[in-house]
Amino acid sequence: CRTNFDENTHKYQRISAIMVERGPGVETEYRYGLMGTRGGGTGRLVFRNVRVPMKNLIGELHSGALVFHQMMIPERLTSAAASLGVRAALDIATRYSDKRHAFGKPIRNFEAVSFLVADAVTQLDAARALVYMAARAVDQNAPNSRRLVSQAKKFATDMAWQVANKAMQIMGGIGYTDVYPIEKIVRDIRLSQIWTGTNEIMNLLIQHEYYKEVLQGSQDLRNVERDAREQDGEAEKCYIDEDMWRVHEG
């Protein structure tokens, strides 16, 4: 909530994080029906003349932005790690493809099916490796942990959506029914690409952090740019339009 109304104050120092308990003035005006993850309720809350005691302040006064940014690291990493649970859908589809027969043989013998399994398990293992890498970076307070967590959240949740759909594709029409839990997994996993920051926002954070690492980081690695045969041809390294015209005009 807004606690500092001084317009000259930095925007990150204008809000505070508080815990609002259920009581007079706190109402749920609308409950949303959800495509998936129906175990958690989602609704529109309305606060009318609600008083919050100072003891319900989370962190320091006016430090709500700091609390939010600190909270996003574990939230996004949790989203990434939870996405690895899509392994269950792949396992169900893999077992099904071994039992289901078509044209006299298990459908796993058709590359159109088995290659979906190969792609899916590769994506799953790659995502798992990135999630563990990001978790290790957070534990070690590594300077690139914010980027790695954003990458893990984006990559793992995209992977989960793709793998869940591959599992349904392997199983065909029966995967679309509630005889198997694949349809539920597909509905549930879709939210992971949206909550705790959409994957488009993750791209924004990733590129920002990586540019900062490359452009502001120390040049302690070998400068591979100097490996070019014409490494000293500075006149040919056109960075702006004027450089291009100057080179071509001789």
Label each residue range with its predicted role.
Residues 11, 60-61, 109, 141, ...:
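Residue-level signature of the cytosolic catalytic core of signaling kinases
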Residues 1-4, 76, 96, 100-102, ...:
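Short, cationic motifs built from Arg/Lys/His that form the positively charged side of catalytic pockets
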Residues 37, 143, 147-246:
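Alpha-helix capping/hinge segments and adjacent helical runs
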